[in-house]
Amino acid sequence: FLSLIPHAINAVSAIAKHN
């Protein structure tokens, strides 16, 4: 599960950067 957290943060970060 801990391995999923960084991936989710990376996705949110990419979305925020794109926006």
Curated annotation (Swiss-Prot):
The modification Asparagine amide is found at N19. The keyword Secreted applies. Expressed by the skin glands. GO terms for cellular component: extracellular region. The keyword Secreted applies. Its main location: secreted. Belongs to the frog skin active peptide (FSAP) family. Phylloseptin subfamily. Has antibacterial activity against the Gram-positive bacteria S.aureus and E.faecalis and the Gram-negative bacteria E.coli and P.aeruginosa. No hemolytic activity. This is Phylloseptin-H1. It comes from Pithecopus hypochondrialis. The lineage of its organism: Eukaryota, Metazoa, Chordata, Craniata, Vertebrata.
